[in-house]
């Protein structure tokens, strides 16, 4: 369906690493991957409840699309990246949380970003094969990592239908902030060991329009709205602006950890909007924290109308995030372009 209005909701939570001093950092998270994922998904559920319960949220209004965004790096765990199995389990868990049609039919979730990893292998030596597999991890080669955003429409009733209502966008450019530089131990991945995997695309093209919903490109259509997603540095590097054959963008979405909306990177059409949720700093006060922005192409900056805190009872937030559970910020419902 085509919506008449859009309402942006940002969960402003610090998603940067924990600083230990003398330039040493560590990723915040639980030591067991499955427990870490379960705890973060539970915290997401608490944030969604806070957003729905806010009086300024239009909740179930069928004419208004609610766009709920988390910052970059919300899902990465104590090593800095989840295993392939962990990423698949995470997607299934998130989709299960937002499948209820009565609660989430008119919501679109931009689930921050998830960092996953895989290891390159080499043939095992003769002695290694005597006691193990034919192929082993090649520690001389970089870890293959992907930093991607799951964009999920809610209200699809059956969990098995979740993939039909989802898109995945891969980050293209790795910044110096994406991984810790000096590890505090505990198996944390340092940036020098990482190589990002690129999105899939036809050879020789510079189009960013998705052909398949999980191909990693940044432009897609959902509910007759054209959305463009840029993750942090991709926005500053004008990923969308430099793409060929870019269709008119209704909503430009920028989840980040260390980025603000850049005037020379905006591509949303007249009547459209740009929305940023950042997990690194409060740029108004100049301190570590989190922030959000909404800008109308024709109307300029949009002010927050309400803020809400989370009920975090029973969730070990201190282990998951370096600076607490943050806050949910609600913006007013805004008119969408008519055509």
Model-predicted regions and their roles:
Residues 48-170:
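Cys-nucleophile CN-hydrolase/nitrilase-fold catalytic domain and related Cys-dependent amidase chemistry
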Residues 12, 113, 153, 170-173, ...:
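Short, structured patches in soluble enzyme cores that scaffold and shape functional sites
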Residues 3-8, 106, 144-148, 217, ...:
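Extracellular structured ligand-interaction cores
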Residues 69, 183-276:
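Active-site beta-loop-alpha substructure in enzyme catalytic cores
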Residues 99-107, 232-338:
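CN hydrolase (nitrilase-like) catalytic-core segments centered on the catalytic cysteine
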């Amino acid at each position: 369906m085509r919506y008449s209005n859009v309402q942006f909701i940002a969960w402003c939570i610090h998603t940067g690493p924990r600083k230990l001093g003398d330039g040493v950092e560590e990723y915040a998270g639980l030591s067991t991957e499955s427990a870490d994922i379960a705890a973060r998904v539970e915290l997401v559920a608490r944030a969604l409840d806070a957003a729905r319960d806010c009086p300024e949220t239009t909740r179930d209004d069928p004419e208004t699309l609610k766009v709920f965004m988390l910052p970059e790096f919300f899902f990465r765990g104590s090593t800095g990246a989840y295993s392939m199995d962990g990423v698949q389990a995470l997607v299934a868990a998130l989709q299960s949380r937002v499948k209820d049609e009565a609660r989430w039919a008119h919501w679109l979730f931009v689930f921050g970003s998830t960092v996953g990893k895989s290891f390159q292998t080499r043939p095992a030596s003769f002695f290694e094969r005597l006691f193990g597999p034919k192929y082993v991890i090649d520690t001389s080669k970089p870890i293959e990592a992907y930093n991607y955003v799951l964009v999920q429409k809610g209200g699809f009733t059956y969990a098995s239908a979740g993939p039909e209502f989802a898109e995945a966008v891969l980050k293209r450019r790795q910044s110096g902030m994406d991984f810790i530089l000096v590890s505090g131990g505990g198996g944390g991945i340092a940036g020098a060991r990482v190589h990002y995997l690129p999105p899939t695309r036809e050879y020789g093209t510079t189009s960013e329009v998705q052909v398949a919903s999980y191909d990693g490109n940044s432009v897609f259509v959902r509910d007759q709205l054209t959305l463009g997603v840029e993750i942090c540095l991709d926005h500053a590097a004008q990923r969308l602006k430099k793409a060929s054959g870019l269709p008119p963008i209704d909503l430009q979405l920028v989840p980040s950890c260390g980025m603000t909306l850049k005037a020379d990177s905006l591509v949303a059409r007249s009547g459209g909007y740009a929305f940023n949720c950042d997990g690194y700093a409060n740029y108004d006060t100049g301190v570590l924290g989190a922030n959000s922005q909404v800008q109308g192409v024709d109307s300029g900056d949009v002010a927050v109308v309400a803020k809400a805190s989370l009920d975090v009872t029973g969730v070990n937030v201190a282990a998951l995030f370096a600076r607490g559970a943050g806050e949910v910020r609600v913006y007013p419902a805004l008119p969408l372009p008519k055509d």
